Amino acid sequence: MAKSKIRVRYAPSPTGHLHIGNARTALFNYLFARHNKGKFILRIEDTDLKRNVKDGEKSQMDNLTWLGIDWDEGPDKGGDFGPYRQSERKSIYDPLIQQLIDEGKAYESYMTEDELSAQREAQKARKEMPHYVYEFAGMTEDEKQAKIAAAKAAGIQPVIRFHVPENTTYAWDDMVKGKVSFESKTVGGDFVIKKRDGMPTYNFAVVVDDHMMEISHVFRGDDHVANTPKQLMIYEAFGWQPPKFGHMSLIINTETGKKLSKRDETVLQFIEQYRELGYLPEAMLNFIILLGWSPVGESELFSKREFIKMYDEKRLSKSPAAFDGKKLEWVNNQYIKKADENEVFAMSIRQLIKAGRLPQRPDMSQIEWTRTLVSLFKNQMSYTGQIVDLADLFFNGPADINDEAKAELDNDTALPVLKEFRQRIEDIDVFEATAIQKTIKSIQKDTKIKGRALYMPIRIAVSHEMHGPELPETIELLGRETTKKHLDAMIAELAK
């Protein structure tokens, strides 16, 4: 197919926030379209009215935009193939369903949910795979019409079922998995294409929409493989050419070794959650691309532009993709390190305000102090939300000192160093890191105490920690009075 004819889509249901797996589906379709100079379409599959949530569509769009994924056609942009919400396309679906009924390829089914449930339970008891059994089997036409009349009189709304062809093989050359085939007898019998509420089912609407919107390629999750033979049956019934299919591997939680599930609470799974924690969109996009796709070479960090240029669907993996939270933190840390200082500052100060560490409207002195604070911890943060805990010393004072730190002060030089430093910081004119460093160096020159023996007692005294950011900068941010307070407390403790 010519590149100019390439049209792909991402078609979420507005039933909640953007999930990692769905974000990957959107991203791989987006990259395929952009690499091949094709079109990327956003379509909203909102036919499951009971499961749709308020603002679900908006949430999907907001998070896609945040990730840097834009679309050429969609409910907000329009296009030549709209409407782009399935709930607005009923007038397109209904005549096509009627066409199938008229051609004997679909029919009204009046079995109630209780009857269907009883049928499934009986099949399970016989150790059979649950499947729909034609409800009018063995009936004469008069008996069939009598049953339908009784159902209508009882107020039962029918569903429309598609008549599954017997003894037929449905196969396709999957762009990821290779050759895949299903026997028609394995799909669970005649399946519903129109629900009792009058809305089409997913498997019917998706075929109609993909055909009408001239979708050329469909990249989606491996969990859709079982839907594909049903969809191929509908394509065949209408005499339409199906698109090329590619089913991407499952995403596995490395902590549990199981498929990433929305019920899995061991890992955050929604893009919104990572936004709130302070992950960078470029880092999230980079990480998600690596879930089932690999670039040539050893490097893993690329810009969106670079990914678009190098993207090759043949490098999609057949093996499950491992969702590794530690890897995500590493990727995001790399992006934070090279990110614009102002961007990281803006994200970090929002986190501090949200946590109540700063007022809703900080004054200029608080803003400048926070700017220095963020620069101090910038390279340590895996995500900007960590600034709240990393900087806890500056808001809540030192945590309890541990035994290892106490042992570090159990020597003959710790107390003299602290006393000297406490005395000399009184003489610092401008209390900033450069002057503080000179003061520490002057103690080294005068006492001959240096290295760990010099710096560690001061660090432990002011922070109760053995490790942390640059000591002079830490002391500058604490301020002269707070530093004196911490030093006095430790000197008193060691003098006992």
UniProtKB/Swiss-Prot annotation:
Q: Which residues form the signal peptide?
A: none
Q: Where does ATP bind?
A: K262
Q: Which SUPFAM superfamilies does the record match to this protein?
A: An anticodon-binding domain of class I aminoacyl-tRNA synthetases, Nucleotidylyl transferase
Lineage top rank: taxon: Bacteria
- Any idea which UniProt keywords this protein has? Aminoacyl-tRNA synthetase, ATP-binding, Cytoplasm, Ligase, Nucleotide-binding, Protein biosynthesis
Q: Could you say which EC number(s) this protein's record lists?
A: 6.1.1.17
Q: Where is this motif: 'HIGH' region?
A: 12-22
Q: What is its main location?
A: cytoplasm
Where it sits in the cell: the answer is: Cytoplasm
One cellular component GO annotation, for this chain's record? Answer: cytosol
Motif segment ('KMSKS' region): 259-263
The molecular function terms of the Gene Ontology recorded here are: ATP binding; glutamate-tRNA ligase activity; tRNA binding; zinc ion binding
Q: Which reaction does it catalyse?
A: tRNA(Glu) + L-glutamate + ATP = L-glutamyl-tRNA(Glu) + AMP + diphosphate
Q: Which InterPro entries match?
A: aa-tRNA-synth_I_cd-bd (IPR045462), aa-tRNA-synth_I_codon-bd_sub2 (IPR020751), aa-tRNA-synth_I_CS (IPR001412), aa_tRNA-synth_I_cd-bd_sf (IPR008925), Glu-tRNA-ligase_bac/mito (IPR004527), Glu/Gln-tRNA-synth (IPR000924), Glu/Gln-tRNA-synth_Ib_cat-dom (IPR020058), GluQ/Sye (IPR049940)
Which top EC class applies here? ligase
What GO terms describe the biological role, i.e. biological process, of this protein? glutamyl-tRNA aminoacylation
PANTHER family membership: GLUTAMATE--TRNA LIGASE, GLUTAMATE--TRNA LIGASE, MITOCHONDRIAL-RELATED
Annotated family: Belongs to the class-I aminoacyl-tRNA synthetase family. Glutamate--tRNA ligase type 1 subfamily.
* Self-association state and partner proteins as the record states: Monomer.
Record function comment? Catalyzes the attachment of glutamate to tRNA(Glu) in a two-step reaction: glutamate is first activated by ATP to form Glu-AMP and then transferred to the acceptor end of tRNA(Glu).
Please state what the protein is called. Answer: Glutamate--tRNA ligase
